[in-house]
């Protein structure tokens, strides 16, 4: 549903016109050749394209060419007429195709010229010429007096001159058979050039176009040679115009030669690429097999550096261990020096507690034994270094003198 809505939103005026034309073709039930002619002579700003003209020409095998020419002239007259025949024609002129009528007229003349220049010589060309001669008054009077009342681009006079010039050219084709033969031969030559250039671009895009080899003279020489040719020459025989007549076998042979040449070139390029890749692979293998002395020196130097670094690391570890041992010793000395400050108040407190014990002081032997068992080794050493007065408590029973002497020893 969303895709349908998007398509409806993206519709333009050209899509709406195409839908209306399709509905009109279905309702009116036009013949296939009429539909092709209507498509080639519509009111679009472009065309008729070569595709449209080719579709018109292919109907010659199903429909006589004079019917196709008559229908083209009928469509031309319908858009030239200033007085509409019915209400439908009036609505079409005043609203639908207003400002674009001249395009239909010019395209009808282009289709007629295309039929004159591209049909086969003989009965087909005679049918078109007889039909145009029958309705010659359309070209002499209606086309010569045609006026463009309004144009969408505002170039009415330019379009009028173009339509009149095209009508005069068709009249010259009808009146001068030699001029018609010359133009038909020139048109065939140009069509052959276009076809050869298209084939060369498809089958030999990288090479120079070979179309110049088929045409060695320019248009001036062509015109100079064409003015004096025999009037009884058949239009199909174009050898006097230096136009090459190629058969289907020759074109197929040339096409095959182009394809074979391209295949041969591709095979050579592929062989060269494979050869280069093989040579590169062999060079790479040789380079890998030869040892690089520079790389070996680098590797040995790196191993030596690694062993040296390992030795240095071992020495560093030994130094660190020795340093750590020294630090441990210093830390022990520091601990032995600082421990008396922390433990001394405890002994003094115990001494004070003994002094404050009213039940009776404990014996000196008990206190010294308890102190010696509780004190660490560092304090024991320090006690040995104390004065004799503090150690020998049995000589004096004054507690305050012992405390005073102990404090002096600490200071």
UniProtKB/Swiss-Prot annotation:
Compositional bias ranges of the Acidic residues kind: 216-233
Any GO CC annotation of this UniProt entry: clathrin vesicle coat
Biased composition (Basic and acidic residues): 351-365
Domain called ENTH: residue spans: 25-184
Entry membrane topology: Peripheral membrane protein
Main location: cytoplasm
GO molecular function: clathrin binding; phosphatidylinositol-3,5-bisphosphate binding; phospholipid binding
Annotated positions of the N-acetylmethionine modification: 1
Compositional bias per record (Polar residues), positions renumbered to this chain: 234-252, 335-350
Residues that bear Phosphoserine: 322, 324, 363, 394, 401
Annotated SUPFAM superfamilies: ENTH/VHS domain
Chain intervals with Low complexity compositional bias: 299-323
Cellular compartment(s): Cytoplasm; Endosome membrane
UniProt-listed GO biological process terms: actin filament organization; early endosome to Golgi transport; endocytosis; Golgi to endosome transport; late endosome to vacuole transport via multivesicular body sorting pathway; protein transport
Keywords of the record: Acetylation, Cytoplasm, Endosome, Lipid-binding, Membrane, Phosphoprotein, Protein transport, Transport
Highest taxon, organism lineage: Eukaryota
Subunit structure: Interacts with the clathrin adapter GGA2 and the clathrin adapter complex AP-1.
Something else known: Present with 8100 molecules/cell in log phase SD medium.
Name by which UniProt lists this protein: Epsin-5
């Amino acid at each position: 549903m969303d895709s349908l809505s998007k398509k409806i939103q993206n519709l333009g005026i050209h899509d709406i016109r195409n839908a209306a034309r399709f509905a009109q073709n279905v309702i009116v039930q036009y013949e296939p050749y009429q539909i092709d002619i209507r498509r080639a002579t519509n009111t679009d700003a472009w065309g008729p394209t070569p595709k449209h003209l080719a579709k018109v020409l292919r109907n010659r095998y199903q429909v006589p060419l004079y019917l196709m020419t008559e229908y083209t002239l009928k469509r031309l007259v319908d858009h030239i007429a200033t007085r509409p025949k019915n209400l439908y024609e009036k609505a079409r002129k005043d609203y639908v195709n207003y400002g674009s009528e001249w395009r239909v007229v010019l395209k009808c003349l282009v289709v007629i010229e295309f039929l004159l220049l591209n049909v086969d010589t003989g009965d087909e060309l005679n049918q078109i010429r007889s039909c145009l001669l029958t309705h010659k008054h359309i070209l002499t009077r209606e086309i010569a007096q045609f006026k463009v009342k309004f144009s969408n681009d505002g170039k009415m006079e330019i379009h009028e001159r173009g339509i009149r010039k095209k009508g005069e050219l068709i009249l010259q084709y009808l009146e001068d058979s030699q001029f018609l033969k010359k133009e038909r031969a020139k048109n065939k030559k140009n069509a052959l050039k276009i076809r050869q250039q298209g084939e060369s671009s498809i089958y030999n895009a990288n090479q120079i176009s070979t179309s110049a080899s088929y045409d060695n003279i320019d248009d001036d020489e062509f015109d100079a040679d064409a003015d004096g040719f025999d009037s009884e020459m058949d239009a199909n025989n174009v050898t006097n115009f230096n136009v090459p007549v190629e058969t289907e076998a020759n074109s197929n042979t040339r096409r095959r030669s182009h394809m074979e040449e391209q295949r041969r070139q591709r095979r050579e390029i592929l062989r060269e690429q494979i050869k280069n890749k093989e040579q590169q692979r062999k060079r790479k293998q040789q380079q890998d097999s030869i040892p690089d002395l520079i790389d070996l020196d680098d590797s040995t130097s790196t191993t030596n550096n690694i062993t040296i670094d390992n030795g240095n690391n071992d020495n560093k570890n030994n130094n660190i261990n020795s340093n750590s041992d020294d630090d441990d010793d210093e830390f022990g000395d520091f601990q032995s020096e600082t421990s008396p400050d922390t433990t001394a108040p405890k002994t003094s407190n115990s001494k004070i507690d003994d002094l404050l014990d009213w039940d009776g002081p404990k014996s000196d032997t008990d206190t010294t034994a308890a102190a010696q068992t509780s004190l660490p080794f560092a304090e024991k050493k320090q006690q040995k270094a104390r004065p004799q007065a503090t150690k020998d408590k049995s000589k004096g029973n004054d507690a305050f003198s012992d405390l005073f002497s102990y404090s002096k020893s600490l200071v």
